[in-house]
Amino acid sequence: MKATGIVRRIDDLGRIVIPKEIRRTLRIREGDPLEIFTDREVKVILKKYSPIGELGTLAGIYADSLSKTLDCTVCITDTDQVIAAAGNGKKELQEMLLSAELAEVFQERKTVLKKSSDAEFVAITKDRSEYSEEIISVILSEGDIAGGVIFLQKNEKKHFGEMEKKFAAGAADLLGRQLS
């Protein structure tokens, strides 16, 4: 018998404490939704729930359409990782974990346009990649942060403007409404 888990008792209200080390490793924060499953072998399985993950196929199609229309890289994320990516460099972004700096931008709950020369330019993932501009728009569902829509530009001759910023905000709004 292998010992890979941690034993916890259930209290009178049916609650189980998830150890801090596991919460930190899996990036589970207070208030995060968890799905509870059971299997035939009497196992209880907890899975971190991602509302944007439920829209995986739609998010992929939408990201691809936006990327072709705007000629840039498009990422659709939940609060932890890139769910869908399209355009130049999508393979290096797909399913990558998001940076802590991006999570802070999400907390501002607004659409931002940043250039790589700006001091507050944010790396999308922990691996820094070469982009000259970015637009970050937060997906809100029933007032909660569900993820983000991110436009990235590698070509330094092309620049994002108000139109692209409105596209990102509109895309985030549409996806947020799909989740509600």
Ranges and model annotations:
Residues G143-D144:
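Glycine-biased flexible loop/turn sites that connect beta-strands or occur in inter-domain linkers
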Residues K47-I61, T111-E120, D173-L174:
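Short, positively charged
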Residues V7-A85:
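Intrinsically disordered, low-complexity terminal regulatory regions
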Residues D64-K126:
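Structured interaction and signal-relay segments at domain junctions
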Residues A3-T4, K68-D71, Y131-E133:
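Short, small/polar residue-rich loop motifs at catalytic or cofactor-binding pockets
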Residues G56, G60-S65, L98-A103, G148, ...:
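Juxtadomain coupling helices with adjacent low-complexity linkers
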Residues E133-L140:
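A short, aliphatic-rich beta-strand micro-motif
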